A protein has these predicted regions:
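An acidic-aromatic loop/edge-strand motif
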Residues: 96-163, 194-275, 342-416
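Ser/Thr-rich low-complexity repeats and stalk/linker segments
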Residues: 22, 28-103, 353-358
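Active-site neighborhood of glycoside hydrolase catalytic domains
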Residues: 399-418, 422-460
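Beta-strand-rich ligand-recognition modules
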Residues: 59-82, 305, 312-363
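Short beta-strands within extracellular/lumenal beta-sheet-rich domains
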Residues: 27-31, 279-292, 329-331, 405
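Aromatic-lined ligand-binding clefts that engage carbohydrates, nucleic acids, or primary amines
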Residues: 44, 289-316, 345-347
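A conserved hydrophobic secondary-structure block that centers on an alpha-helix together
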Residues: 155-195, 200-202, 298, 308-309, ...
């Protein structure tokens, strides 16, 4: 019986070796990618230790040997902008073939939610941008979120390149899209955009450990993050705090007999006054609208962002909720919920920390196949209960160094034209803003060192605030 198990295990191992490929490229490489023009190009990956790896590009052949860890890298000559080309990598037993490769300028696009915000979030403000034909000279890839506080990751998580078209535009970074839209026709070359950004992240998340250790408070937060179980315990505590806050709020609503709806609406609030600064707690918003007919389809409410969490109802029926103040609300619903004549939207809002209600500047709209109209005028609202602010939670992505190691360091061999950076709200507080000028300088030095380009261009937006300061 033991011998049979050994035989079966041996067969499984031999099959694994033959079935699963040893040769692979770093995940930044793929069909449709853009490589940097007028510079040597690094192409790298992994194979079986000792394998001869051959790379074929534009009629040229490059050869190398995989090292003891299986890593390999070839460096090509300089190439002019152009495409499409193919890229072939092979060993004696395996082959990888990539198609639709272009050579042009490659830009790394990083920061917090300013850079991460997708075109789908600005569609209501820029509808004309979505009526486009395919532009193969603008390409985009997003680096998936990944953290490491102890060492640099060797590779990013799997992702794919996309050329710009009417479908892919929705997932493009809005800031990066408008940057490329302006730049590409002026240069008349392919533009590659690599998005590596995380909402809410401070500058400290994107610097290397050596730089982090130069700042006492930053080094302390990094050392805490390295401790086993530390972040998990913080997350658990944050979750408990949030649950307790909700339970206390619900108890107050029940005691005041306003859990399901307010007794009356005593106030109106103009859209231009939002968000307002009364207090944290629970509010109820209400608006009526009139329909001449009810034979509609593709019905939805677009409400923009709401501070902080909402539950939304149409004619007394629940149609959706969102917990995050930074996410645009778009709620699709059955047209059967509508009626000819007066209809009512009601929104129950839980405000945890600051600035309750709608966000001035966001589009608010009723949409359907036949009729669209804006909802950006007066709303009734009721103040249901006051609550103490919920203590700010801990986000693991905001700890120092983790994003540098996880989402920048794995790209270190890539050749770039430059970096566009849009970040700052997370560092705009009084105790952080002054330190930002030094820490952002550290980031630029870190990245230039990482990519081995001492004059790597950095185009950046400085310390934008979130909403008005008052």
């Amino acid at each position: 019986m033991v011998n049979k198990k050994i035989i079966v295990l041996s067969i499984f191992i031999s099959l694994s070796i033959s079935i699963f490929p040893q040769l692979r490229l770093a995940n930044i490489f793929g069909d449709g990618m853009v490589l940097q023009r007028n510079d040597s190009i690094n192409i790298w990956g992994w194979s079986k230790s000792g394998d001869k790896v051959s790379v074929f590009f534009q009629g040229d052949e490059y050869n190398t040997i995989a090292n003891n860890d299986g890593k390999w890298l070839v460096q090509t000559k300089h190439y002019l902008a152009g495409g499409p080309f193919s890229l072939k990598i092979k060993t004696q037993k395996e082959e990888i073939y990539l198609k639709d490769i272009y050579v042009g300028d490659v830009w790394l696009c990083s920061g917090q939610s300013n850079m991460h915000m997708k075109m789908k979030s600005v569609k209501e403000n820029y509808p004309e941008e979505f009526n486009l034909t395919e532009n193969k000279n603008i390409r985009f890839i997003e680096v998936p979120s990944q953290l490491n506080f102890n060492k640099s990751e060797q590779d990013i998580k799997n992702s794919n390149w996309s050329s710009l078209n009417s479908k892919s535009i929705f997932k493009f970074s809005a800031a990066a899209y408008f940057f490329a839209k302006d730049l590409q026709p002026k240069l008349n070359i392919p533009i590659g955009l690599i998005l590596s950004a995380v909402g809410g992240s401070p500058v400290e998340s994107w610097i290397c450990e050596k730089s982090a250790l130069n700042y006492k408070s930053v080094a302390k937060r990094l050392n805490e993050a390295k401790q086993e179980g530390f972040l998990e315990n913080l997350h658990k505590k944050d979750k408990e705090n949030r649950q307790n806050w909700f339970l206390e709020a619900e108890e107050k609503l029940l005691n005041n007999d306003v859990f399901y709806q307010p007794k009356s609406f005593d106030h109106t609030y103009k859209y231009k006054w939002f968000p307002f600064h009364k207090h944290t707690g629970v509010y109820w918003f209400k608006k009526e609208f009139y329909l001449d007919e009810n034979s509609l389809s593709d019905t939805r409410l677009y409400l923009g962002k709401i501070g902080d969490s909402d539950s939304t109802f149409l004619n007394g029926k629940y149609i959706g909720n969102t917990l995050n103040r930074y996410v645009d609300r778009e709620y699709w619903f059955s047209p059967k919920l509508l009626k000819k004549g007066n209809n009512t939207i009601e929104i129950k809002v839980y405000n945890f920390r600051w600035r309750a209600g709608f966000m001035f500047g966001d589009i608010m709209e009723f949409k359907s196949n036949q009729t669209n109209f804006r909802l950006m005028d007066e709303w009734y609202f009721a103040d249901l209960c006051e609550m103490p602010p919920l203590k700010a939670g801990e986000n693991k992505f905001w700890r120092p160094v983790g994003l540098f190691n996880g989402m920048i360091a794995p790209l270190s061999k890539l050749k770039l034209k430059g970096v566009i950076w849009y970040q700052g709200e997370a560092n705009a507080k009084k105790d952080l803003a002054f330190a930002y000028r030094d820490r952002f300088s550290s980031l630029i030095k870190d990245w230039r060192s990482l990519f081995e380009k001492k004059d790597l261009p950095f185009l950046f937006v400085q310390l934008p605030n979130y909403l008005k300061s008052n």
